[in-house]
Amino acid sequence: MLLSSPPVDKRGPQPICMTTMLSPADTPVPADTSILSARYRATTIGMVALVALHAFEALAVAAAMPTVAEALDGLRLYALAFGGTLATSVIGMTLAGRWADHHGPARPLWYGLACFVLGLLLAGFAIRMGMLVAGRLLQGLGAGAISVSLYVMVGRSYPEHHRPKVFAAFSAGWVVPSMIGPALSGLIVQHLGWRWVFLAVPLLAVPAALLLRPALARMQSTAVGDRDDGRGNVVRWASGASLAALLLYFGGQQQGLPALLCIGAAMLALLFCVHRLLPTGTLLLRRGLPSVIALRGIAAAAFFACEAYLPLLLQRERGLSPSWAGAVLSLGALGWFAGSWLQGHQQRGWSRQQLLRVGTAMMTVGIVATLAVLFNPVPLPVALVGWALTGFGMGMIYASLSVLTLSLSAPHEQGANTSALQLSEALSVTTALAVSGALFALFVETAPHTGYVLCLAITCGLAVLATVIARRV
């Protein structure tokens, strides 16, 4: 059988045209593909700087507070100086979310920054402990508003494919302060005085915020007409939730029956309030956004409750020095950044749901491995690897939930939903720490090993629950 030859092109030789299939990695991309391109550079640097300053302030104040309380003769208000900040941040988060949805993120950001800076100045110039506590309450109000406003800015300023990288940068903004913040705070207290722990932050926060002015000016209000945003009701429920959070914090400092009564009453009040503040179905773990909001709270509670007791466990039960116990926590911070970076740069095309399932599984395995060192036959390196793995999983979870919240929200809902995301975290962590703290205080004198086991069982249970919720997102 003869093969016919191809027809001859009478036009003569033609230039050869080769078509190549480009992989996604080889596909040309716009010039502003980086979050540090000219279009986004000032916004990115300004937001990350504010995140880093907030992180440094939180960590540095925690390290300096014993000196502050002694200098102002205010040990009896020591707990309120910490818990009050969290309580007022609940109000700041909630109000900023509603405000940003109706008028854009500029107003809540500027008002939040004003409260934050004024609170720092009030605390820095405090002549008595009551004045310092007032400053801390104002700080919390401002910090809550700033955090929600920044999330809304991410949703309004960056296209969806940039958002994972922005949230990875936010994680980086926490890593450096977590590594050097406490030590730097100690040096400031020792050589400059404790007041500069508060007074130094405004000097940097205001210039960082000014970098955001061009981006904020481009954002328009998403309000439709003059609709009522129900701000009065929001204030009432947010105030109730903040008081319940404060009562939880107070209950966690008590022992025996008073602790149980405080925590029980606070949890009932908290459930009643958050039912009105969180998206419908959050407490029932409905699929979609409600499960995203719930997962943020459960995963954060598991991680931070474990982190609270890990240094104590390593020092008292395994004989590590404070510096080595702190080094273990630093591994978790580095793991968190690595996991957050991976979710923003992974090339396998994993969906956010897949990242959440892998992240929650890694966090659960890491927590179990970390807490296994409660038993002496388990070698200490297991805790090092376990806590790094826990941080890695949490980095994947945390940033992915932030991205999902924005993608599942209409522009006029981003403020309310991001405030619900952070509200879920704050209140869940407070509840977990209060309950575990009360249990630990109950057994620490008579059966400390039992106290550790009960507290760590709570963190493991929360981690397992997080893996279940991740399949409902």
Model-derived features: positions:
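Membrane-embedded alpha-helical segments in integral membrane proteins
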Residues: 58, 62-66, 118-124, 175-190, ...
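Helix-loop-helix hairpins in multi-pass membrane proteins, especially solute transporters
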Residues: 90, 97-228
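12-transmembrane solute porter fold
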Residues: 40-63, 82-84, 92-95, 106, ...
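Cytosolic juxtamembrane N-terminal segment immediately preceding the first transmembrane helix
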Residues: 2, 10-11, 15-56
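Extracellular/periplasmic helix-loop-helix junction of adjacent transmembrane segments
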Residues: 64-90
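Short helix-loop-helix connector
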Residues: 69, 73, 126, 142, ...
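Hydrophobic transmembrane-helix bundles of small-molecule transporters
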Residues: 190-296, 307
